[in-house]
Amino acid sequence: MNRQRRYGRTLPEALGEYARRNPARFHMPGHKGQDVPYGGRLAGWDVTELDGTDNLSNPEGIIAVCEGAYRDAYGARSSMLLVGGSTSGLLTMSLALGRGRRVLLGRDSHKSALSALALADHEARFLLPEINPAEGLAGMLTPRQVEEALQEQPADAVLLTSPNYYGLCADVEGIADVAHAYGALLLVDAAHGAHFPFSPQLPEFPAKKVDLWCVSVHKTMAAFTQSAVLHVGKHCPMDPERVRRVRNMVQTTSPSYLLMSSLDRALYVATKMGYQRHMDRIEALRERIGRINGLRVLGQDSLGFGAVDMDVTRVVIDVTERGIDGTEAYESLVNSGVVCEMCDAYRVVLITTPQDPDEWYDRLIDGLTHLPYGVSQIHKDPPYIALGRQVCSMGEAMLGPTERIPLAGAVGRVAAVALSLIHISEPTRP
């Protein structure tokens, strides 16, 4: 990527220059770059809108250049930085539709997607993803499912999650064609796929077919937590300025320059370093894991049931043949100095990036080799996802009057929140 920018510097360079000048800071934030726990350069770079640092709400300088670089890298019509993660992107996409629209989405959508529908007072129509019974794992929505649903009842938009937490990817292009044929926009929560444009060995994202999509750069690239980007597709009928205006409504008016700077840097790192060396490392790592007794890495043989491709940098390890469940494997790995992204009943999930030191992979192999053995085979049950009968809108359910009742008395009642059990944090050591 050509870094000879119109304004002659990047966000990190501008912030570094300002910190080196060490002016008397009579502006926000209150720590003034001085005595804060993390100290040093990081505190010095935490500034506000100043001469030379641009303004995220209406960028015309270095932020605009950064957004333009993302636009070009992702093949979008317009790209906008997000400092509230893909949650703020989903809120923006939902509200940009207007209010009271009909939206078709998968039952496995992220909770922030449900919040977005509630806040916009949209009518949600849920579809069940395909189920892979052999893996005990939910697959993805299919073009046929979407078409049948739109034939039954029109919708203003289809909201698709792809890739999912396991790195599985839906037929986004096929679903886009169906949605557009029935007059619906296609919105994609691609939070876990920010890195896809940087290697031909990663799933191809059909940017030309999608209307709006968001990516969580912080999940898989070298950016700070909460750093994300919202993209407007080249053929989206919606005015990008409308999208930006809505983005400004749901995002703080005091955006973190540390987050924006990390977004700028993350794109530079991805384009300069590339992913080829990492793809080679991951191929070798997956082979090493596959040679460990009782372990199996999800691969191309796990596709189908709506999944047409997968992100091989998302290493999903099935531990059931070892006679243990995912939680036992997770906790054992923690004790070996390895912390996974998450686990479920049968697997542990690891997010790998080019920033991983090679030594971590050796430590992982050692931890996996020393996983305990269970006394019996773990049998997989297909996930049960019930649609139920909708009796009110998401907004009425989530924002209406509520009361807390015992679980035994909840039959026939409407849930105000979604409750689930998921192991995504480091367990307390004994």
PLM features per residue range, with description:
Residues 1-61:
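N-terminal "arm"/small-domain region of PLP-dependent enzymes with the aminotransferase-like
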Residues 7, 11-16, 37, 73-76, ...:
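Conserved PLP-enzyme active-site core in the AAT-like
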Residues 42-85, 108:
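Conserved N-terminal alpha-helix of the aminotransferase class I/II PLP-enzyme fold
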Residues 78-80, 337-341:
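A short linear hydrophobic-aromatic micro-motif
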Residues 277-336, 347-366, 370-372, 384-411:
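Conserved PLP-binding catalytic core of the aspartate aminotransferase-like
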Residues 374-381:
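Conserved short beta-strand edge segments in small beta-sheet-based binding/regulatory domains
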Residues 409-422:
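Short acidic, Pro/Gly- and aromatic-enriched capping/linker segments at domain boundaries
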Residues 422-430:
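Residue-level detector of conserved catalytic or cofactor/ligand-binding positions
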